[in-house]
Amino acid sequence: MKLSKKLFDEIIYTVKISPYESGGFVGGVTDTVTNVVYDSKNSYFASYIPDNDLLNDSIRTWAKNSIEFLGMFHTHYPNCASMSLGDEKFISELMKNICDENDILYFPIVIARKEISVYAAKLINSKCEIKKDELILLG
């Protein structure tokens, strides 16, 4: 996944003032994030639950400007860079419900409000495969 240094810094700054397990949505073109929407409605101690209305509104608004929905991000506590079983289950269900075969969505995890670890999910033969992805900072 590609992300400008400016957006990287914006995400890190914004989540510093948000509770852990908060998140948002990323949009852009192919594998390059150009837009971020922060979701502050549903933050809980141990999990991030996206605001479906905000997500759907974001997707509709982006579509009018040829911006694709690329995925969701959320924050984790320090020393927790990997996906939880809950994360994997949520992503698998999401992929099966909204994606076509071979679609890829990205699920960045912001760790300790200072770094970003990216995972890519792909639907192959109706099964969701989640793999660590490289974060490429642009500019």
Spans of model-derived segments:
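Conserved beta-strand-loop surface patch within small alpha/beta domains used
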Residues: 1-69, 78-139
